[in-house]
UniProtKB/Swiss-Prot annotation:
HAMAP family referenced in this protein's UniProt entry, alphabetically: EF_P_modif_A
Keyword match Ligase: yes
Entry GO CC: cytosol
GO terms (BP aspect): lysyl-tRNA aminoacylation
Source taxon at top rank: Bacteria
Function: With EpmB is involved in the beta-lysylation step of the post-translational modification of translation elongation factor P (EF-P). Catalyzes the ATP-dependent activation of (R)-beta-lysine produced by EpmB, forming a lysyl-adenylate, from which the beta-lysyl moiety is then transferred to the epsilon-amino group of a conserved specific lysine residue in EF-P.
Protein name: Elongation factor P--(R)-beta-lysine ligase
Source taxonomy: Bacteria, Pseudomonadati, Pseudomonadota, Gammaproteobacteria, Enterobacterales
Signal sequence region: none
EC number: 6.3.2.-
Single GO term (MF): tRNA binding
Reactions the enzyme catalyzes: D-beta-lysine + L-lysyl-[protein] + ATP = N(6)-((3R)-3,6-diaminohexanoyl)-L-lysyl-[protein] + AMP + diphosphate + H(+)
Amino acid sequence: MKKKIWKSSASIEDLIKRSNIISNIRLFFSKKNILEVETPILSRSTVTDVHLTSFETNYISSDNIDELKLWLTTSPEYHMKRLLASESGSIYQICHSFRNKELGRYHNPEFTMLEWYQPFCSMKKFIKEIDIFLQIILKCNKSDKVSYQDLFIDFLKIDPLCANLLELHQISKKLKLDHLTHSENNLNKLIQLLFTLKIEPNIGKEKPLFVYHFPAEQASLAAINLKDPRISERFEIFFKGIELGNGFYELIDVNEQKKRFIRDNKERRSMNLPIRKIDNFFLSALSYGLPPCSGVAIGLDRLIMLILNKKSIHEVIAFPVDRC
């Protein structure tokens, strides 16, 4: 029988459940007096991160003379931080985000993101807040917490903050991964590969796990730890072998942020990727003054997939990319 691809890939029953879950999420934030905000999906700039590929489009004036390049946002992060600098206080947003070259069991080019920021909140305190959120929404047990360093030592018997390339290649060979790693000479990329292939699928099986203090090389937009410059104030959330969220105690130093953007673009050039225009609106907000804060981005489709006990996010989205 021919597949009815015009129909929703999620059942109507599951779409009703999805709607109820999102209502409960909004209720959670409403009870905490956290402001729900809306920011643009179109942006004049995009991310420099080498791991993200943005969708781009063009605005054309009514007389067809002027053209403005725009990007679909990979997350609402930069716009929400501009609101934080405008003294919005604690905020959250549920919105669609867009990432090219991402499609699979846990990926769709268009997906739903929950992003949440809490000013004057340490990473440790924010993790406790997110844990409460997960217990309420997922109806799960209290989470575990472990450092990135300790995970590597527990699983692979190696310290990622001290290891050299030779040691990592020896571990890769022992794990029979050398066919994937033998040509990799970037220490940080090799560490990330080992984490993705050998640690990530095996953590957070029974309850959510917060992995914190990622190496400084993987800081992204997180601050560097003041006591140990080898680590960042970045954390990720895993449950049942799936990455659910990514969070930071946020970098607020405009000069350091600009350096990271420039470094990203240098890496893009070395990888023959397009150089990205730096978001000067965002840098201006940092220059004006972003309050010390923590933030997290949670993949809402993945969260709902776990709640409804589905095997793919395509079972909880009405029209994924093959049906849109």
